[in-house]
Curated annotation (Swiss-Prot):
May be involved in the negative control of osteogenic differentiation of osteochondrogenic precursor cells in peripheral zones of fetal cartilage and at the cartilage-bone interface. This is Unique cartilage matrix-associated protein. It holds the Pfam family UCMA. PANTHER family: UNIQUE CARTILAGE MATRIX-ASSOCIATED PROTEIN (PTHR28647:SF2). Belongs to the UCMA family. Residues 58-116 are annotated as: Disordered. GO terms for biological process: regulation of osteoblast differentiation. The modification 4-carboxyglutamate is found at E71, E75, E84, E88, E91, E92, E96, E98, E102, E103, E107, E110, E114, E117. Residues 28-64 form a propeptide. The gene is ucma. It is found in: Secreted, Extracellular space, Extracellular matrix. It comes from the Eukaryota. It comes from Xenopus tropicalis. The lineage of its organism: Eukaryota, Metazoa, Chordata, Craniata, Vertebrata. InterPro entries: UCMA (IPR031386). One of its GO terms (cellular component) is extracellular region.
């Protein structure tokens, strides 16, 4: 009889143990409207790379290894385009400054011409012909 009791207690303990494990697993499963799968996906994206990144991962060179011709060409293209942009910028600035200086000189000439003309009109005595008629055609 003792043997039957031990067998019964062992089976009962196993059933209780399996029931506890089943409840534990079902509690670990999340419901569908839970936002946790998004976290799982973001964690997955942090751990795993995209295919394009993974293919380039092993192609990356070390710090001391020589550059490939493609890298050298790409760097030269970037350098040349930066130089061209810088050249265009400074040329534009120089043209704007030259235009500004030219306008200032034209305004100054206009003002001085007006002042000279006013002075001549004020000092004209009426006896000799006016300055306008004394201009020499070159």
């Amino acid at each position: 009889m003792k043997r039957n009791q031990v067998l019964f207690l062992t089976c009962a303990a196993a059933v209780v143990f399996l029931a506890v494990l089943h409840v534990g697993e079902s509690a670990a499963v999340r419901s569908k409207d839970d936002p946790a799968p998004d976290k799982k996906e973001s964690l997955k994206s942090k751990i795993f790379m995209q295919g394009s990144e993974a293919s380039n991962f092993f192609k990356k060179r070390g710090k001391r290894s020589p550059k490939s011709q493609d890298e050298i060409n790409a760097e030269n293209r970037q350098r040349l385009s930066a130089d061209e942009r810088r050249r265009e910028y400074y040329e534009e600035q120089r043209n704007e400054f030259e235009n500004h200086v030219e306008e200032e000189q034209d305004e100054q000439e206009e003002r001085s011409r007006e002042q000279i003309e006013q002075w001549r009109q004020w000092h004209y005595d009426g006896l000799s012909p006016s300055y306008l008629y004394q201009r020499q055609n070159i």
